[in-house]
Design a protein with these regions (language model features):
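Conserved acidic, metal-coordinating active-site core of Asp-based
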Residues: 76-185
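Active-site phosphate-binding/coordination module
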Residues: 1-96
């Protein structure tokens, strides 16, 4: 990376499902701080050099309704909702609390979905024991044209993003923001 970025003047970034706080250390350990990072699996583009969110793709309100339906149908599921700069949890127990510690973000815990501010959600993670998450995943994937993107991140988590959002979109966003004439590789 050092040779590519420093000697050849190339551009390199990291694309991750992580948030601003949990991505900071790995990102800043590389010589790439002048290039923004892709966060929240493409929902956010963050500039660590200027400490500024450059682009954020919040989940459509249809996504909120899906989360509401999941928490009603699967009351044991834990939910972590990541915004551009904070986290909310619903029904936080073992899995969501571990995520909150790892994320190291300002956060608020809620018992019910109706208590959660419904704006600025970048990524929703459904968490729990593998059989529960598998049932949630199966239920969500059975929806025709859900107007959101789903991503399987582990056997104990399943993620929801705005429709059309993924890490590749974030890389293209960086290319557009930087005025790059070449397509990202």
């Amino acid at each position: 990376i050092c040779e590519f970025v420093l000697e050849k003047k190339g551009h390199f970034t990291l694309a991750s499902g992580r948030n601003i706080s949990s991505m900071r250390k790995p990102f800043q350990s590389l010589p790439i701080t002048s290039t923004p990072a892709v966060l929240l699996n493409g929902a956010g583009i963050y500039d660590y050099e200027h400490e500024k969110m450059l682009r954020f793709h919040p989940i459509d309100p249809a996504g909120y309704e899906l989360v509401r339906a999941v928490t009603k149908k699967f009351p044991a599921v834990e939910v972590e909702i990541l915004t551009n700069d904070s986290a909310y949890t619903i029904n936080a127990h073992m899995f969501a609390n571990i995520m909150l510690r790892a994320d190291n973000l300002p956060h608020r815990k809620f018992k019910r979905i109706d208590e959660v501010p419904p704006e600025n959600w970048g990524k929703v993670i459904f968490l729990g024991m593998p059989p529960l998450v598998s049932a949630v995943k199966q239920d969500l994937l059975s929806i025709k044209d859900p107007n959101v993107n789903f991503m399987s991140s582990s056997i104990s988590s399943f993620e929801l993003l705005d429709k059309g959002i993924h890490k590749g979109v974030g890389v293209v966003d960086i290319s557009v923001l930087s005025g790059s004439e070449r397509s990202p590789t």
